[in-house]
Amino acid sequence: MAKKRKCGVLLPVSSLPSKYGIGCFDKKAYEFVDALKEAGQSYWQILPLGPTSYGDSPYQSFSTFAGNPYFISLEELIKEGVLTKKECESVDFGTDATSVDYAKLYEGRMILLRKAYERSNVYMDSEFRRFQEVKLIK
């Protein structure tokens, strides 16, 4: 039996539309996946998802296992109540919607993500603490 051919699209997550400087896994990503399905596509090929280092290339990451914090949805963090829309909109992510200003992104987004982490109280969660303990033991 012959295998059925399938097709897909290569689109870096960073290329998704966003008012916060870079595309991420938010509502726009879900809409893109829905559009792919509607168009009969089977695959969404994305570039590596690791954090970028100098040069901001997805192929030059300083971690094999970590995810890129730029792809965390600020809109979801607003919904969760750990950031406000005003805080996110007060950050300068650059003015060119067709390219990513990584210097501004690094400065602004990391401050917001730190605030969200501190407000989340995840470090007080017993399941998270058990996870940390298991990682320390191994």
Each language-model region and where it sits:
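Acidic/aromatic-lined carbohydrate-recognition and catalytic surfaces
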Residues: A2-K138
